[in-house]
Amino acid sequence: MRLIATAALVGVMLHAAPSVLAKQPTVVDVPNGPAFVKLPGRKEVNARSGQDLFDNTVLRTSKPGRMQIKLSSGRQFRMGGNALLQLKNSTVKLQRGALIGWIQPGLKNRQPFTIQTRLATASIQGTTVFIELDDDKLKVFSWEGEVKVATTSGESYTLQSGEQLLVELNQPTITWSPPVKIKEAEATRRLTKSRLINGFATPMDTLQDIERELGVKALDRS
């Protein structure tokens, strides 16, 4: 009887193993604080590398804080400045601040990486997008590949590498305009100065793709 019970218990454990061992979102790197994590039902604590996260976790940084997160889907993003966001399944809900997100190159059957704001949702089809939201503006910039943007007011746009969608929010009426290609000099400036691209423990997976696509070089060669 004991042998049967033990075997049954092992069977239950093996059956449950896939869900128990499922990958959790994780804090990958925290180059600078202040950076904070608030797990569901818990108090806010300082973010630390290797920390496991869960659905509905709230992440926050204050200047000069920044950190890198890897989701259970394998998508990654970096956030910084006065940023605030929530993890919701495989979607990132950005309430304010700056974020750069990417899909690892070479993945087969990869699904889009979705980042939501109160004004629009950006869906990464290619590999890398930068989003910044504050009281004055919403900026969506495709570093590499295709990014689809759907606004809450019904507009739809598709950005290609080097294109930017910029919306001024300090106007009586929010007006959306088609994305525009930024100049090479501006792309170089952003790539070399960005605190979300440079200064982390390891370079972004898509950095070489960005450099090849835009013909510019970053400083980060960690």
Predicted feature residues:
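Short, exposed beta-strand/loop patches in secreted or surface proteins that constitute
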Residues: 28, 50-52, 85
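Flexible, membrane-facing loop/turn or short amphipathic-helix motifs
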Residues: 38-42, 106-111, 133, 151
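N-terminal post-signal-peptidase region of extra-cytosolic proteins
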Residues: 39-56, 62-65, 126
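Internal catalytic-core helix/loop-beta-alpha segment
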Residues: 121-127, 134
